[in-house]
Amino acid sequence: MENEKTIDALNELIEINNDRVEGYETASSETKSSDLKSLFSELTRTSQNNLSELRAEVNRLGGKPEEGTRVTGKFFRVWMDVKAALTGDDRGAILNSCEFGEDKALEAYEHVFENHTDQLNNEQLDMIRKQQTALRADHDRVKALRDAE
């Protein structure tokens, strides 16, 4: 399939956004803090919007959007750390874990830019840049809250 590498690159981003949705839904259900619940809901929406765009593009290219998450290691453990931190309701630890997760999401987008730009057209690159900008804004919100603790 001529679009296979493009679909693979887009599916990498789908996986990281699936991770993010799963992680923040877990975090939101576990915390008692209403401001964190609200934040996690907004962060989940960012990834849901990203997923909608990415899945539509994979479908347009004739591929099958990834449904799973990256259970290969680091990112999955981050969310387990978030859950453990939430059990103790330690805002600083929660936000620290969330910032680490945000770093991983940004790294996934950077990886696509560094390794797959020749497989993506201008519209796809623009979509991914826009998503990366939104994720960076989310990262900065989490970091600012963490720094304020």
Where are these regions (language model features)?
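A structural signal for well-ordered alpha-helices, especially hydrophobic packing surfaces
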Residues: 21, 51, 55-58, 79, ...
